[in-house]
Regions:
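Acidic, surface-exposed loops and disordered segments
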Residues: 1-113
Length: 113
C-alpha cells in the first residue's frame, strides 16, 4: 500500500474490544513509533503502558469519559529528561526559558503516536 492509499483509508476507532494485546505486539508498536523522526535523535517523550483495568478506568475519567473497554492504554508524554542529561554531560545551560523545547517534545510525542 502506498502512502496516499494509506492516508485515504485512514479511519478513527472509538470502540475497542477487550481482547488482550500480546506483549510482543505492544513491543513492536513501541519500537515502530520510536523509529519516527525526532528532535536531535533525543526522543523527547516517554511512553507509559497501562494494562490494569482499574487504572484504565481512572485514566478514562481524566480523558473526558473516553471508553475504558480497551485492554491497554498507551500514554505518550512530552519529556525533556534526555535533553536535561545531554546538557549535564556537556556542561551547558538548559534553555528552558523558551517554548522551543516544549514544542519539540510535543512534536516528537505526536510523531511517535
Amino acid at each position: 500500500m502506498n502512502t496516499i492509499d494509506l492516508l485515504n483509508n485512514h479511519r478513527s476507532i472509538r470502540r475497542y474490544k477487550s481482547t488482550p494485546v500480546p506483549q510482543e505486539l505492544i513491543d513492536r508498536l513501541i519500537e515502530a513509533g520510536a523509529r519516527a523522526s525526532n528532535t536531535g535523535n533525543m526522543q523527547l517523550y516517554s511512553v507509559i503502558v497501562t494494562q490494569q483495568k482499574e487504572n484504565i478506568e481512572a485514566l478514562s475519567k481524566l480523558h473526558y469519559g473516553q471508553g475504558s473497554t480497551a485492554p491497554l492504554f498507551l500514554t505518550i508524554c512530552a519529556d525533556v529528561n534526555r535533553y536535561h542529561h545531554w546538557c549535564r554531560l556537556r556542561g551547558c545551560d538548559e534553555p528552558y526559558g523558551n517554548l522551543l523545547w516544549l514544542l519539540s517534545a510535543t512534536v516528537d510525542a505526536s510523531l511517535f503516536a
